[in-house]
Amino acid sequence: MKGAIAALFLIVSSTFGQSAKSALMKPSALKEKAPAMYTAKFETTAGVFQVEVHTDWAPNGADRFYNLVKNGYYDGCRFFRVVPGFIVQFGINGDPAIQRNWESATIPDEPVKQGNTRGTITFAKTSAPNSRTTQVFINFKDNSGLNRTGFAPFGKIISGMDVVDKIYSAYGERPEQARIQTEGTAYLAKSFPKLDYIKKATIEK
């Protein structure tokens, strides 16, 4: 009986996992509108922190983040760029097949309504217009210079900033984003084994 239950659990888990991956393979289908305010919980190898998102700060960013968290995109993602006194960045999926589908799934830029103060979370972008996709960063300190270059925060850490502060930082900016995108978690696990990562991210309310 126990064996049958265990087998059923494995089948259900496998089916759920395949369903989640299937959803993440189609960015254009994940366009649910986020609530005016919501909380996302991040369970990581460093501990737990919570993000309170304010959709009116940056609607495009808030909607994208909501869909990514809700559909498990950030689960397993490493904190690959950690610069003490500046930011901690994450959001490249560990599965290259999924990552490829999101590289061109950009969202429009929007005005900076809330400053990049300590504990705020913001989508990363390049110098090109409308280049935000999945990568986000949390500000370790007040980074007002980012306000002038169009980085629009969409939320803030409401608990667990002490956890964010202790995310492993010794590798700095050494992990190569291009290799993470093409090789995924395998590259990071082999070359940067001490990186902290997200075990599970969920929408709480």
Pin down the residues of each PLM region.
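Sec-dependent signal peptide recognition
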Residues: M1-A7
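Hydrophobic h-region of N-terminal signal peptides that target proteins for export
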Residues: F9-G17
